[in-house]
Every structure is written in C-alpha cells, then in structure tokens.
C-alpha cells in the first residue's frame, strides 16, 4: 500500500481508497469486484485498527520500472444493498425488526443495542428505493445510528452503545509526538438553528383533537413566540405516545447542529462509534468526553514506490468533526419517496365477500406492483375511500 484515504461518518457507508503497487501488470480487475479486503495499520509492531470491506471499484494505473499502480475502492458489505431496488410493504413490524430482516437478506454481520421502546407499525412501504436507501431512511426516522466495527455493522438508539474511554492528549506540536494518541488541533463552534420543532397529524377517529407536539431547541423561547420554527404537517403518528419519540428525535437532530467541533490528530483508532476523552487542553471545558461524527484519515508510505519515494517517510493524520460525548447524535431527517400520481390497485377481501370493510367502512386493496402480498384480506392496510355510491344504503349523493 503506497497511499490510502478513509472517509467515515456516523450512519453512512465508509469509503476506503487504496493506492497499491504490484509487480504484475495483468491482474484481472473483474475478478477483484466484491472480494473481501482487510486493511490494517500497525505502529511499533502493535495493530492500531483493522478495516474490513469489499472491493466496489478497481482501476489499473500506470506501469513503469516493472511496477504497476492499482487503485481500489473498498466499502462495507452493507454497500451491496445499493444494488437491489424494490417496492414492497412490511406489515405489523417495528423498525428494528425490518432492519434485521434486510440485513439477514443480504447476509450482513451485525449487532445492536437498543435502550428505547420501538413501536410496531401497522405498515411501512418501500417504494422504488434501493434496499440501502430504505435502510438509511428508516434508521434516520427511528432515531438510530449505525457504524462499523471490524467486519460487523453495529446499530443503536443511544450513545451508550458506543465504545468509550479512548484517551487523546492535546499537543499542538504534532511533530514532537511519539505515540499515536495526539490531537494537535481542536476547534469548537456554535451555529444558528431553528428554535422550536412542531409536529402535527390527524386522527380520523378523533377529528376534533389537536394532535400536535412540540419541543423547544432553544430554552429561551419557552412559552414565547419565535420566527424560527421547524413545522412538519405530516407527523406520521396517530397517538400522543407515538408522537413524543418522533418529536424528540427531530429535536435532537437539529440541536446537534448548534454546537460542533473539529480537530486533527494522528490517532487511527478514532472512528464513528468511538467516544474519546481529551486531556491537557489549556481550556478546561475541552478536557471531557467527545464523540466522533465524521473523520477523514489519510496515510502515505512512499517506501512502497522504492526509488521514487524520495526522502519523505511514512505518515498518517486525520481531520474529524465531533460533538459532546454525553448526547445522542441523530441523523438528519430523510423524506420518503412520493408517488408520481394516482396508484392503480384492486379492492380485495376474503373469498365470498361482496365487499370487505371494517367498522369504519375502510377497505383493503392490493397494489399491482406488490410482488410479495397475496391479493386477499391481508393485503396492505385499511384504506379510507370516497365515491358517489357510498353511505349506509349505497345511495348516490349529489
């Protein structure tokens, strides 16, 4: 390996770019695709960290002095979910249950730690989305985070699922560092955000009830009017108990933008899912716990190029963003895909029924794009409808 770059972010796929040197100029690039890769960084004979993934792109570069340069892009096995697009309906499952079924479908090694209660949803629709886009949307919507540890994906609904107690020493003179645990730059800033989050929905069973919930991001606006509000008119809930987690997660996602830090270090152990403790910073408030949100590692080993390496030696450094290690980071909200227009479906029900309705007059339908559900009384969910020939006597109303 002559050079590498590793880009990582909470709740995103990592991308490892490798520049390799080989004596062979005839390596079959097609045979490399989707092959497993393990990349290790060793310092003073001690392994700092291992990154596991699959090859998603391979390029042959220049050949000179009996050596050929190859460029590989490595991403986690979860990336394979981008290759499959589907439309389907999941019935009466919680989001963690849906995510688990997706990961098992693609043979992804995973683990999770869930500290909160996650409601069972009547139905969840995947519509013309890749499996990964659907996965990422549900993760953000449900307030989950995911990251990668060795060859395994890990997801959690709390920062308590992260690995803590990674020590970093602040030293702005990085050239004097003798260990790979030095942070040589630390910046902390604040940004303006909306002051309040408001979610509203409508329950036809209680049409007069104002199904509205709010959360104040800025405590100074408690009980006051503000121009800066984030209002969602479609909250995706039917009960107060279901609304509170949605509002709280959106509140946390916006609040995460209020204060954020950035830094540089030589520590390859830093990664999303890690909480580090900073020490020896001249500002006392900085000597506390912080969690990694994004990080970009870059390393170079010129010796791999032999006579072309010049006088420079091996080096590794990174740039990263971080937030408080005591708060929960939430991914930015992802909106679900919208239908292009009217959807064609067939009204369904049990065999022998003229029309199958519930106590509220709702019907069940089977969408023509649904490849997984049978066209019977278990298809989709109960759907409200309006037509000219409705009412208790099926009479026409004009």
Predicted segments with their positions:
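Amphipathic alpha-helical and helix-coil boundary elements used as assembly
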Residues: 1-398
């Amino acid at each position: 390996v002559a050079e590498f770059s590793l880009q990582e972010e909470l709740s995103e796929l990592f991308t490892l770019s490798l520049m390799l040197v080989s004596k062979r100029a005839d390596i079959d690039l097609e045979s490399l695709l989707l092959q497993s890769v393990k990349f290790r960084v060793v310092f003073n004979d001690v392994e700092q960290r291992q990154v596991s993934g699959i090859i998603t792109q391979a390029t042959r570069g220049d050949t000179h002095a009996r050596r050929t340069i190859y460029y590989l892009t490595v991403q986690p096995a979860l990336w394979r979910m981008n290759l499959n697009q589907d439309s389907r309906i999941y019935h009466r499952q919680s989001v963690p249950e849906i995510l688990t079924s997706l990961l098992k479908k693609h043979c992804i090694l995973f683990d999770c730690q869930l500290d909160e209660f996650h409601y069972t949803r009547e139905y969840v629709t995947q519509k013309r989305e890749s499996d990964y886009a659907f996965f990422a949307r549900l993760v953000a919507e449900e307030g989950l985070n995911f990251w990668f540890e060795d060859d395994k994906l890990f997801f959690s609904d709390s920062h308590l699922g992260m690995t803590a107690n990674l020590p970093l020493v602040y030293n702005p003179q990085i050239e004097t560092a003798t260990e790979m645990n030095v942070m040589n730059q630390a910046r902390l800033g604040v940004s303006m955000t909306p002051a309040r989050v408001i979610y509203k929905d409508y329950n036809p069973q209680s049409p007069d009830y104002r199904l509205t919930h709010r959360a104040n991001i800025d405590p100074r606006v408690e009980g006051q009017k503000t121009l800066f509000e984030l209002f969602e008119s479609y909250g995706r809930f039917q009960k107060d108990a279901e609304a509170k987690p949605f509002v709280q997660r959106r509140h946390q996602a916006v609040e995460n933008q209020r204060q954020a830090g950035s830094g540089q270090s030589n520590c390859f152990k830093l990664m999303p899912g890690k909480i580090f403790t900073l020490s020896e910073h001249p500002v006392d408030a900085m000597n506390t716990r912080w969690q990694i949100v994004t990080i970009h590692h870059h390393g170079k080993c010129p010796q791999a190029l032999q006579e072309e390496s010049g006088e420079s030696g091996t080096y590794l450094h990174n740039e990263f963003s971080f937030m408080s290690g005591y708060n929960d980071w939430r991914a930015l909200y992802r909106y679900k895909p919208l239908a292009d227009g009217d959807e064609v479906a067939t009204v369904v029900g049990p065999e022998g029924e003229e029309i199958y309705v519930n106590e509220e007059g709702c019907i069940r339908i089977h969408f023509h794009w649904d490849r997984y559900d049978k066209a019977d009384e278990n298809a989709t969910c109960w759907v409200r409808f309006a037509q000219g020939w409705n009412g208790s006597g099926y009479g026409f109303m004009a």
